[in-house]
Regions:
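Extreme N-terminal leader/targeting segments of oxidoreductases
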Residues: 1-18, 36-37, 467, 475-479
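N-terminal Rossmann-like FAD-binding beta1-loop-alpha1 element of flavoenzymes
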Residues: 16-43
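Residue-level detector of alpha-helix initiation sites
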Residues: 24-25, 214, 367, 449
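Glycine-rich loop(s) and the adjacent beta-strand/alpha-helix scaffold that form part
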Residues: 36, 49-50, 193-265, 446, ...
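Redox-cofactor-proximal catalytic regions of oxidoreductases
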Residues: 61-132, 337-340, 344-348, 352
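Conserved redox-cofactor binding core of oxidoreductases
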Residues: 102-189, 406-411
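A glycine-rich dinucleotide-binding beta-alpha-beta segment and adjacent secondary-structure elements
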Residues: 170-183, 325-336, 341, 359-363, ...
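FAD cofactor-binding and catalytic pocket of flavoenzymes
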Residues: 235-241, 245-359, 364-371, 412-415, ...
Length: 479
């Protein structure tokens, strides 16, 4: 069932067992899992069926620290959430990402990758993925890895008809959950703002917050402020340990032999470090994206010459007025260390149209990120040399420790942390079942629960964790 606004929903008489706020990949996945087990779900989407500027304005905010995107540019506020601009790259977090590392403070999840594996077949079905090939070591330190370019499923489009026909899911559009009401043990209700006005409150036995890697923190921070920590009773880590995937063009590669690794359909290949290399070199996880540069005609001859006689190639290119790269560009996207000071906060004065404080994001890259960028490129270069596969040229700004360029991608638009998973309430917000510490009936879905970020795009892992949470809630609510 689909309703436009809370009034139409109330007129239906639908009674939910679970209220989910946010109809993106996590929220829709959890709702479908619960409905399949006969559990009734009210699924609240703050936006409508399509993009509109008025709704998107609610996502404006400010950023302090390193250059970053506008907060209303890096996510979307309508049915399907940020899947509506997802590029479609898929890979689940690596096993090493879940492990504690002595050189990475506050690393280590309370679960393992094996806890997600029972749900991966469903993930593949939902995201329309082919089977992943196993990682292929090209040295002790570097392995070829597969990222699959999926059809970039738009969750709102794909599941809209199924939801509209469901007797167990009530999707309520244009209805913004502004805050939750709790007493430090249970959430009793959610306050709503619907179609431009006060929507009252709605009660349910259980609540799931799944509004994204920024909004989850915002909603809970505002709820806590209004209820004297009645929603997150142990708030030390709330909004904290926020992470992105910094990514930059770090250099070029001249390739002699590519037979040891595979390219995808658009001439790209992906590499990441072994678990042993991460520990020995004291690195964060990282991914190198190798993009072949196809040159037609005369340019191809010069590019080929660059592999054999770079000085001659440079002279020829200069004489022809050509600025040629080597045979491949190297983009490095990396894990970010979970830092307490990187956090989502409420702006002290700026509010949205519903009166909710906007986000003030505090975000900086640290020394471990810079170390990983340089050492990762060195490690990849060493691997090419040892195996006579090619050579790497590292960009001068990377090699000499200059400032990060501001005219590149900056980051992956991947919002992780803020309500991270852990066993210690002083350093986490949810437990291994994604339940908020100290609360009986409040759960969180999405990448905000990531303890660490790994190096790969988060959507595949978001869906796997959402399926796991749906399975857990089914067990809890069926008792």
């Amino acid at each position: 069932m689909i309703f436009d606004g809370i009034s139409a929903f109330r007129a239906s008489g639908f009674t939910p067992q679970v209220c989910i706020t946010g109809a993106g990949p996590a929220g829709i996945t959890i709702a479908r899992e619960l409905a399949a087990s006969g559990i009734s779900v009210a699924l609240f989407e703050a936006g409508g069926l399509e993009f509109n500027d008025q709704s998107q304005d609610f996502y404006k905010g400010t950023v302090k620290g390193d250059p970053y995107f506008g907060l209303d540019v890096t996510r979307l506020r309508f049915l399907g959430g940020s899947s509506n601009h997802w590029a479609g790259w898929c890979r689940v977090l690596d096993a090493v990402d879940f492990e504690a590392k002595p050189h990475v403070p506050d690393s280590g999840w309370p679960i393992k990758r094996t806890d997600l594996e029972p749900f991966l077949d469903k993930v593949h079905d939902m995201l329309e993925l082919i089977s992943f090939k196993p990682d292929k070591p090209i040295s002790d330190d570097i392995r070829w890895v597969q990222l699959i370019k999926s059809p970039a499923v738009r969750f709102g489009e794909k599941f809209r008809e199924e939801i509209s026909k469901s007797g167990k899911i009530a999707l309520v559009l244009n209805t913004y959950v502004t805050d939750l009401v709790g007493d430090g043990k249970r959430v009793s209700s959610a306050r709503l703002w619907s179609n431009g006005g006060d929507g009252g409150e709605i009660a349910a036995p259980a609540f799931v917050v799944a509004t994204g890697g920024l909004e989850n923190s915002r909603l809970l921070l505002w709820s806590n402020q209004k209820t004297a920590n009645g929603v997150v009773p142990e708030p030390a880590a709330l909004g904290r340990y926020w992470m992105e995937h910094p990514q930059f063009e770090g250099g070029d590669a001249i390739l002699f032999d590519t037979s040891m690794f595979e390219h995808d359909a658009v001439g790209e290949a992906f590499f990441s470090p072994s678990a042993e290399a991460i520990g020995e070199r004291k690195l964060l996880n990282f991914g190198i994206r190798l993009i072949e540069q196809p040159y037609p005609g005369l340019k191809a001859m010069i590019a080929d010459l660059a592999c054999k006689a770079p000085e001659t190639a440079e002279w020829v290119a200069t004489g022809l007025g050509q600025h040629l790269r080597c045979a491949a560009q190297l983009y490095v996207g990396g894990e970010q260390s979970p830092g307490f000071d990187n956090h989502v906060a409420l702006h002290p004065s700026d509010k949205d149209a519903a009166g909710v404080p906007r986000i003030q994001l505090n975000w900086k890259k640290g020394e471990l990120e810079r170390h990983t960028l340089l050492e990762g490129l060195k490690l990849f270069g060493e691997t090419l040399v040892k195996n006579n596969l090619g050579r790497v040229r590292i960009e001068e700004w990377v090699a000499s420790g200059q400032d990060y360029p501001i005219d590149q991608e900056l980051a992956g638009h991947h919002h992780m942390g803020g309500t991270r998973m852990g066993d210690d309430p002083k350093k986490s917000v949810v437990d291994r079942d994604c339940k908020v510490h100290g609360m009986d009936n409040l759960y969180i879905g999405g990448s905000s629960v990531f303890t660490t970020s790994g190096q790969c795009n988060p959507t595949t892992s978001i869906v796997a964790l959402a399926l796991r949470l749906g399975d857990h809630l089914t067990t809890v609510l069926k008792v």
